[in-house]
Amino acid sequence: MYAETLKLVARLPERRPAPVLPARLDQLFRHLALPACDAQDLEEEIWQVWMHHPHRRAAIALDRAADDIAAQRFDLAETRLERLVRACPDFPEAWNKRATLYYLLERDEESVRDIHRTLELEPRHFGALCGLAEICASRGERDDALFVFQAALRVNPHLDSARTSMEQLRSGTSH
């Protein structure tokens, strides 16, 4: 899955988001690409849109799973997210949250699988891209990590943490 996900990252610029995602994300990402923008506010708004689901129960389940992750109730979070991705397989943030959970549990293969699905549905998901880059770096795949961080910066040029990680990877002071 790792190699297929890197191939998907290479094709992200030509991919379109899933039709289930709100069209207003397009406008938010256009603004985020501008050098002079309030990137923090735009990022927060994008995350809010990603966390939202038209079915209230799905949004509540995602919020609860996020709370479970924050409280380190990982088994409960995994159960909630398993149910959520089964019930709403086109909900990118459900897949991304489960990828995050698996990353925290050092279950990288499962995390990459869910990142792959996230990026299939939302190719602009800079959070998923940064997560994948971190996994690449932890595997010692420096060039792959740099490639994926660069893809994240193409989507969101204001990701200072990605720039810092790239500098550390280039200088050999990280991962």
What is each of the regions a protein language model found here?
Residues P13-P19, W47-I60:
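TPR-adjacent "capping" and linker segments in tetratricopeptide-repeat scaffold/adaptor proteins
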Residues H55-G127:
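Alpha-helical adaptor scaffolds
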Residues L32-P35, R142-S171:
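TPR/TPR-like (Sel1-like) alpha-helical repeat modules
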Residues L34-D41, A70-D75:
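Helix-turn-helix repeat elements of alpha-solenoid scaffolds
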Residues A70, L104, S138-R139, S171-G172:
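Register position in tetratricopeptide repeats
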Residues F29, E44-W47, E82, H116, ...:
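Alpha-solenoid helical repeat scaffolds
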